[in-house]
Amino acid sequence: SFRSMYLGLSAFLSANKDRRDLLLSQRQPEFDVSFDPRIAVAPDDFSRITLKAQAAKDYFLLVGPPGTGKTSRALRGMVEAFYREGKQILLLSYTNRAVDEICKTLSAITPEIDFIRIGSELSCDIPFRSHLIENVLESCSSRREVHACIERCRVFVGTVSTFSSKTELFRLKTFDVAIVDEAT
């Protein structure tokens, strides 16, 4: 929407010079080199990908053709690693179908990772409707309980469009990591 584009432009223009330079490719993204020895001896590609994502100080891009395990294996590994570190994680995709795939991946993780899906029942697969924010919060009887529930949950999932129109969530929650799946 116009409002979300306007807010995005405003955020970009009010960002510090270093951030603007990064976004305009005027400087390279930075990585924590202390991960290099572990990356070098990682047992497989997906372990290496997870470690490289953890080493990223700015952003990490994973590009590959469909069906190569980017969502089912790489995203899962990243979520598990960041979750173990106590990070607040935002998972986004451009379509509700892709968001449901992320939810399916999250549901397969053991021990179970609690997550909240932002969206509507009409666009959410039945197995994941119990994770919709309105269903998670329906037992809350006060604002304090709502805030505590949102604070307690460390993984939020939804479409880019839904999150860009629900900016009030960002006043309640700060995320350490954002992963955008299928960001073509």
Please describe what each predicted stretch is:
Residues 53, 65, 93-94, 182:
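Conserved residues at beta->alpha junctions
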Residues 63, 92-94, 158, 178:
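Generic beta-strand/beta-sheet core signal
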Residues 66-68, 73-74, 78-107, 114-119:
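Conserved RecA-like ASCE P-loop NTPase motor core of nucleic-acid helicases/translocases
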Residues 96-99, 122-124, 162-164, 184:
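Conserved nucleotide-binding/hydrolysis micro-motifs of P-loop NTPases
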Residues 136-184:
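Conserved RecA-like ASCE ATPase "motif II neighborhood" in helicase/translocase motors
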Residues 56-62, 86-88:
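Pre-Walker A (Motif I) flank of P-loop NTPase domains
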